């Protein structure tokens, strides 16, 4: 093993000297942000350029989806990036894996301006910077009577008409939680009855989706008429099928948030606090919302009804939502994935 | 001199594979034997689950069918291409590569348009009155195989055209001029000489389809889950790298077994085949 | 000298091409649609999704990275792969059999496990910067094409020609370049094409080997698709095809298109 290790190092080092010359060495003060990577132009104009003036630093991005970036952060033992944007269930996993620093709320004055729900959604860790909903959408031209309850998913007239989020997506486990409620049990305690209810859904499900674009394709080609979805996909679905409607559910929708955390190995902690405070400020949140990037979580943001219609917006709407227990959900997730596979895999 | 060349020429590539692949992957797979419940507990757990065994068998079945279909389709097409005059031949090869230039998401969208409930195939069949209700073609083993064959036929064509080109034409002509019928010429001259190419193609297609995950996920859904998707779930959703590595180790062992069986068959057809 | 092809075989090949090209018609159609979602037949014609590719800075930047990585990675893999393929065929009897299996391993190990392991033990273990490790990872990923596809062409090469050249005093390297290489050209080009395309499309390995400041085009496209479901992805595919056709046209004008074959 030692010899192998030696050859390995020798090869790597010789190759590194050959190829490594091309990449510049790190600058003295570089702030690294891990995030998804879409909407780069707006992110740059609204957040990065103004923040550069505040911090007098270089800004570098690591991009990719939640799982990719969290996996890499873990492999590097929490080093390499300063702040990381994640959706709620992934940031909970990062917390459980010890990847983030605890947050000192006094260093983020703008926290006071955001909705209570978003200040510390996952214990002592990072705040939410945007809020969304998971609910049901349906084609009002083809689904009659309209969908008014989570229980409608089980309706016999919706045979081969439904798409659920796959168990491995952000919203997937929420389908399991709703199935538990439908069966009248606690989904975390009574897995058996919960998955009986999931199984009862099977004949209504055409295919479960794994990405937003897959869902939009299923809707636009008419394969699916009813779906459990996140609100940001609605506009695209309506562009494809005008009659797609966000259902008004009597039980209410489920909240989802995206969080921002300071990584355990951050070497620019003060800057990280400044950055988080900056993206929660009214000015940034206002711009991001007006340009259709993210729904605002700052209570002082003012939107016209037209700007607001694509977002979860306003105290009343936000107040009607509830967060799920991420720690409970993540603890159950492995078991749920197996059960879900068994139900839909047969 | 010969000795130096014999061992020296493959050395850089061998070192690269050992250092960059075998050692790192072995270190990862080694973690699967470190479980508290015993060295093979994760493997026992895998094979004790009926669902996981079903996923394994389905993956094997889909990969083998895909390989067989791609072999036949690719071989015949490559044979025809190899007979074409130079310029047309190049154009056909380029055209065959085009499917590989499309991303998996748009490609599966195209299949949605072709095979979907309101798709082209169903519309055509209904309009000529062959069927009255749209057929459910998507999210079946069939749709996964079609989409995979689509992806692997180009690879087979590219691999085999080069090989079939290399077969000296005077050999087939000699065989024909000696009075051999086309079929014996094919079986006794062309097929053995093409065997190295067929085996390389078969190995590339089998390994490629056995480990694929995006195509089965998009065109098969959960009902057609394959090993690649299962591994992906473990690694990227539950961050269970021990579980993922277990699946990977099982996949590697099975693929090596199948690849060596293929090589053995190939050597029977043509002792020169690697 | 082309020989005649049996009409049935010709018809079969024509059907295969129909199968291969029909989905592309849908993709081209979808890329031209003036809608914010993928649809076919296209509704309204627009080139805006093509313009989108050029307007988004991240696409431009990552496309350059992808091209660099694919080119250098493929070149590196051919540089070490072709000599290996040559030796495996030239000294077939003397070299151990497992050696040829060894070179299939990079596509045999599931890609994400390969990428994960490489990141864990090489990049992090040795502190190798992101860009060279991306190139190394891709070179290894496509090595099977370099070794095996070229090897398949070499299998039908008659090595006695090479011996004849060498016995006439031609030095080994020159013999290889002037006698062997022209005979396996189609195989080398096929290997290059397959390797290049595999590298430029790769997601699973790149996911792990990219890092702060460096990303590749397929990963950037996936990032875009987290939020937008528009036909940009179809446009990228069509653009890749157009670039291929363009490159071929240039080759046709300079070298003649028969370069792909002997």
Stretch-by-stretch model annotation:
Chain A
Residues 20-26:
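Sec/Tat signal peptide C-region and signal peptidase I cleavage site
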Residues 27-93:
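Early extracytoplasmic/lumenal segment of secretory-pathway proteins
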Residues 38-44, 80-81, 85-223:
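Extracytoplasmic ligand-binding site segments that recognize negatively charged/polar headgroups
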Residues 89-93, 220-221, 225-243:
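A ligand-binding cleft/hinge motif common to bilobed small-molecule-binding domains
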Residues 132, 196-201, 209, 240-264:
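Periplasmic-binding protein-like
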Residues 135-142, 178-181, 257-269, 287-288:
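A bilobed periplasmic-binding-protein/Venus flytrap-type ligand-binding module shared by bacterial periplasmic
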Residues 263-321:
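Mature extracytoplasmic/periplasmic domains
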Residues 305-346:
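Extracellular/periplasmic bilobal clamshell ligand-binding domains
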């Amino acid at each position: 093993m030692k010899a192998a290790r030696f050859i390995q190092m020798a090869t790597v080092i010789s190759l590194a000297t050959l190829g490594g010359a091309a990449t510049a060495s790190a600058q003295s003060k570089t702030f690294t942000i891990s995030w998804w990577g879409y909407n780069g132009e707006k992110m740059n104009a609204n957040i990065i350029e103004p923040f550069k003036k505040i911090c007098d630093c270089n800004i570098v991005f690591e991009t990719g989806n939640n799982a990719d970036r969290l996996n890499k952060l873990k492999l590097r033992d929490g080093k390499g990036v300063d702040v990381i944007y994640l959706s709620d269930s992934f940031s909970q996993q990062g917390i459980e894996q010890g990847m983030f620093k605890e947050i000192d709320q006094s260093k983020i004055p703008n926290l006071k301006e955001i909705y209570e729900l978003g200040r510390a959604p996952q214990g002592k860790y990072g705040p939410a910077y945007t809020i969304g909903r998971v609910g049901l959408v349906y084609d009002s031209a083809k689904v009659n009577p309209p969908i008014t309850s989570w229980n409608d998913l089980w309706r016999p007239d919706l045979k081969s008409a439904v798409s659920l989020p796959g168990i491995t997506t952000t919203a997937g486990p929420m389908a399991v939680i709703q199935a538990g409620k439908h069966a009248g049990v606690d989904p975390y305690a009574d897995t058996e009855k919960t998955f009986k209810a999931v199984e009862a859904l099977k004949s209504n499900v055409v295919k479960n989706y794994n990405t937003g674009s897959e869902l939009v394709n299923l809707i636009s080609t008419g394969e699916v008429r009813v779906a459990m979805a996140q609100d940001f996909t609605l506009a695209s679905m309506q562009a494809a099928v005008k009659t797609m409607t966000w259902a008004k559910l009597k039980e209410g929708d489920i909240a989802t948030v995206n969080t921002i955390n300071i990584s355990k190995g951050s070497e620019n902690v003060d800057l990280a606090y400044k950055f988080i405070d900056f993206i929660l400020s009214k000015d940034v949140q206002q711009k991001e919302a007006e340009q259709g990037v993210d729904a605002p979580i700052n209570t002082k943001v003012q939107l016209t009804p037209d700007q607001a219609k694509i977002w979860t917006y306003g105290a009343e709407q936000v107040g009607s939502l509830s967060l799920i227990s991420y720690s409970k959900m993540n603890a159950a997730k492995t078991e749920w994935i197996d059960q879900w596979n068994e139900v839909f895999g047969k | 001199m010969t000795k130096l060349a014999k061992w020296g020429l493959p050395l850089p590539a061998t070192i690269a594979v050992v250092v960059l692949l075998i050692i790192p992957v072995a270190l990862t797979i080694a973690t699967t034997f470190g479980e508290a419940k015993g060295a093979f507990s994760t493997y026992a757990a895998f094979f004790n689950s009926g669902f996981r065994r079903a996923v394994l068998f389905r993956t094997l079945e889909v990969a083998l069918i895909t390989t067989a279909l791609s072999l036949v389709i690719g071989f015949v097409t490559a044979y025809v291409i190899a007979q074409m005059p130079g310029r047309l031949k190049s154009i056909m090869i380029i055209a065959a590569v085009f499917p590989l230039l499309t991303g998996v998401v748009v490609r599966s969208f195209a299949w949605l348009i072709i095979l979907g409930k309101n798709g082209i195939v169903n519309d055509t069949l209904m309009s000529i009155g062959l069927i009255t209700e749209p057929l459910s073609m998507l999210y079946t083993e069939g749709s996964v195989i079609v989409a995979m064959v689509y992806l692997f036929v180009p690879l087979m064509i590219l691999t085999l055209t080069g090989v079939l080109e290399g077969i000296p034409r005077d050999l087939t002509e000699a065989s024909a001029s000696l009075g051999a019928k086309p079929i014996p010429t094919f079986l006794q001259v062309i097929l053995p000489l093409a065997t190295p190419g067929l085996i390389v193609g078969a190995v590339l297609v089998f390994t490629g389809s056995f480990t694929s995950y995006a195509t089965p996920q998009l065109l098969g859904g959960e009902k057609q889950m394959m090993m690649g998707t299962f591994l992906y779930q473990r690694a990227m959703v539950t961050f269970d790298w021990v579980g993922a590595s277990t699946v990977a180790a099982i996949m590697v062992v099975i693929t090596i077994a199948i690849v060596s069986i293929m090589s053995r068959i190939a050597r029977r057809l043509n002792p020169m085949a690697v | 000298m082309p020989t005649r092809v049996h009409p049935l075989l010709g018809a079969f090949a024509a059907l295969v091409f129909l199968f291969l090209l029909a989905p592309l018609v849908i993709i081209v159609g979808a890329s031209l649609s003036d809608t914010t979602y993928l649809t076919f037949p296209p509704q309204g014609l627009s080139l805006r999704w093509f313009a989108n590719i050029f307007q988004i800075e991240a696409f431009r930047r990552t496309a350059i990275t992808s091209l660099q990585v694919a080119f250098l990675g493929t070149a590196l893999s051919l540089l070490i792969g072709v000599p290996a393929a040559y030796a495996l065929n030239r000294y077939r009897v003397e070299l151990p059999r497992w050696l040829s299996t060894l070179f299939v391993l990079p596509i045999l190990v599931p890609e994400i496990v390969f990428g994960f392991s490489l990141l864990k033990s090489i990049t992090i273990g040795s502190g190798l910067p992101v860009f060279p490790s991306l190139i190394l990872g891709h070179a290894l990923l496509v090595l099977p094409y370099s070794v095996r596809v070229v090897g398949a062409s070499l299998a039908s090469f008659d090595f006695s020609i090479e011996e004849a050249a060498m016995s006439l005093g031609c030095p080994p390297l020159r013999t290889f370049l002037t006698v062997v290489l022209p005979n396996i050209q189609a195989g080398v080009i096929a290997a290059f094409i397959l390797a290049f395309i595999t590298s430029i499309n790769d997601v699973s390995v790149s996911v792990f080997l990219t890092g702060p400041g460096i990303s590749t085009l397929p990963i950037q496209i996936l990032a875009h698709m987290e939020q937008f479901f528009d036909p940009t992805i179809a446009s990228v595919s069509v653009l890749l095809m157009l670039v291929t056709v363009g490159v071929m046209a240039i080759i046709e004008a300079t070298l003649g298109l028969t370069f792909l074959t002997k």
